[in-house]
Amino acid sequence: MSAIFNFQSLLIVILLLICTCAYLRSLVPNLLDKNKTGVLGIFWKCARIGERKSPYVAVCCVVMAFSILFMQ
């Protein structure tokens, strides 16, 4: 099933996008900082969410991992 129609898969994709963008911005800041607007600005916004809300994102990742491992 597509990640668009399955809510849990959609949450996984969003969490992975946030974590990946935050990690890439920590390695190469100029890569995401030059695209703050437009369609590519989504990646910059995801990186900002990952940096500023990192404890909440980490908790969500752990909860999602446990739900995938033990609930399915």
UniProtKB/Swiss-Prot annotation:
Keywords: Glycoprotein, Golgi apparatus, Membrane, Signal, Transmembrane, Transmembrane helix
Membrane topology annotation: Single-pass type I membrane protein
Residues with attached carbohydrate: 35
Cytoplasmic membrane side: 72
Signal peptide interval: 1-26
Segments on the Extracellular side according to the record's topology features: 27-53
GO cellular component: Golgi membrane
InterPro entries noted in UniProt: KISH_domain (IPR051523), Ksh1 (IPR009653)
Transmembrane segments: 54-71
GO BP terms in the entry: intracellular transport; protein secretion
Subcellular location: Golgi apparatus membrane
Functional summary from the UniProt entry: Involved in the early part of the secretory pathway.
Entries under PANTHER family matching the protein: PROTEIN KISH-A (PTHR13229)
Family note: Belongs to the KISH family.
Protein name: Protein kish-A
Species the sequence originates in: Xenopus laevis
Gene assigned in the entry: tmem167a
